[in-house]
């Protein structure tokens, strides 16, 4: 059982460390707003991972195989949401360019909205859908007991929370924030283009 937990932990940390919508959302929120806002987003992402992990432990890959239409809806819906997020970031970058001398406009000042945006970002994340629907399911076969499944669920949850807490803390450092102030419009524009790209890729690859 320890080997199973170790393998899952290693696979999951690699999945977390590969840049994707979750990473860019947390880092952009931390550097442009605050660590508190980023941590609310981290909690939202962690709750999203809990949903995916729970469904995967109940047999997500079997559901997707038998209900192809559901897979299409998830992919298209997630892609549209990521495209919308990309559009919002690109629009914000253009506003910064038009009013460079003024203070940056903070669109999501309320912590509750950062939590919700983090949750929706993860639930619409193509990497999460593919990972939990295929790779993750390989480790939770019928021979894995209830205790081990609960252990894996807890491991995935804590690992996700720990990793994105580190990301939020690093990008909220004063040095990182000063760098963002100088390059705000370019960073937001780049992040927006990435989100839109993720969304378009998700829609056309369904």
Curated annotation (Swiss-Prot):
Taxonomy, superkingdom: Bacteria
GO molecular function, one term: amino acid transmembrane transporter activity
Stretches of the chain found on the membrane's Cytoplasmic side: 65-66, 174-206
Recorded GO CC terms: plasma membrane
Bilayer-crossing regions: 1-21, 44-64, 67-87, 150-173
Keyword Transmembrane part of the UniProt annotation: yes
GO biological process, one term: amino acid transport
Keyword tags: Cell inner membrane, Cell membrane, Membrane, Transmembrane, Transmembrane helix, Transport
Keyword Transport recorded: yes
Membrane topology annotation: Multi-pass membrane protein
Annotated compartments: Cell inner membrane
Periplasmic compartment residues: 22-43, 88-149
InterPro entries (alphabetical): Homoserine/Threonine_efflux (IPR004778), LeuE-type (IPR001123)
Similarity comment: Belongs to the Rht family.
Biological function: Conducts the efflux of threonine.
Record protein name field: Threonine efflux protein
Source organism of the structure: Salmonella typhimurium (strain LT2 / SGSC1412 / ATCC 700720)
């Amino acid at each position: 059982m320890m080997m199973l937990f170790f393998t899952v932990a290693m696979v999951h940390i690699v999945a977390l460390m590969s840049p994707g919508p979750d990473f860019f959302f947390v880092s952009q929120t931390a550097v442009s707003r605050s660590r508190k806002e980023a941590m609310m987003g981290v909690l939202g992402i962690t709750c999203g991972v809990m949903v995916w992990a729970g469904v995967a432990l109940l047999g997500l890959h079997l559901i997707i195989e038998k209900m192809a239409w559901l897979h299409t809806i998830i992919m298209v819906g997630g892609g549209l949401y990521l495209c919308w997020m990309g559009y919002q970031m690109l629009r914000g970058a253009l506003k910064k360019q038009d009013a460079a001398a003024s203070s940056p406009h903070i669109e999501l000042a309320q912590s509750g909205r950062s939590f919700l945006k983090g949750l929706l970002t993860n639930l619409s994340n193509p990497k999460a859908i593919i990972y939990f629907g295929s790779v993750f399911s390989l480790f939770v076969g019928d021979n894995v007991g209830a205790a081990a499944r609960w252990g894996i669920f807890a491991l995935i949850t804590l690992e996700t929370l720990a990793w994105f807490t580190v990301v939020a803390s690093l990008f909220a450092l004063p040095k990182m924030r000063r760098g963002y102030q100088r390059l705000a419009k370019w960073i937001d524009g780049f992040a927006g283009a990435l989100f839109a790209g993720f969304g378009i890729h998700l829609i056309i690859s369904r």
